[in-house]
Amino acid sequence: MQYEHKILLVDDEPLIRRSMQKTLSRLGFEVITADNCIEGLTTFEAAQRSDNPFDLALLDLNIPGFTGQPQEGAGLELLSRLHEKSPNLPVIILTAYDEVHKAKVAISRGAREYFVKGRDEGLVDLMDAILEK
């Protein structure tokens, strides 16, 4: 299958990761997953060195950080590191928490959007809108 866009999905919850990967793959996205900041950054760097870099990243807000331990807001640290390497990479922060202040922090740090997990409707439309820009 020829994919139109390559997506990095970083989430530490296996069920959510598999479900999102399956759904997005069926819709024509190539989805590469990681379950923590270290793996996410390593995967991103490898793709950047290839001729097939990522077009967009979906990052869970609270994932194991660069210490390997679960860390609140670690997704924001990964966001910063990804933007050091690729400033124009569109990033959507995923979270289970519907809190406006977290959305503002994510966007102020360079995320294009903030999406609350569990409401799957709307994510693909959001991704399409960002990728079309």
Model-derived features: positions:
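Conserved acidic carboxylate
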Residues: 11
